[in-house]
């Protein structure tokens, strides 16, 4: 996982492997004390998908990475999720 700062000062993350992404996400879940249900509710995804991410069986998309970054405080405005996804695509 690599956190990158854009020219406007906002932060987002890139990832190299599914395992590293799962490790990073698991650490953040542990740090925040949130449950899978709470995270799923915030991101509007299923708990099964999150479990697959954590176990490295689900290949995260750029949208997933940005959404998790916003959830865990790396991005200030949720609208940046969509801006970053557009920039990447």
Question: Predicted regions span which residues?
Answer:
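Conserved hydrophobic/aromatic packing and binding residues within compact polymer-binding modules
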Residues: 25, 39-40, 50-53
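Recognition helix of helix-turn-helix/homeodomain-like DNA-binding domains
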Residues: 44-60
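Short amphipathic recognition helices of helix-turn-helix/homeodomain-type DNA-binding modules
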Residues: 79-89
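Helix-turn-helix DNA-binding elements, focusing on the entry/boundary residues of the two helices
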Residues: 36, 47, 62-65
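A short, Lys/Arg-rich alpha-helix, primarily the initiator
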Residues: 1-35, 42
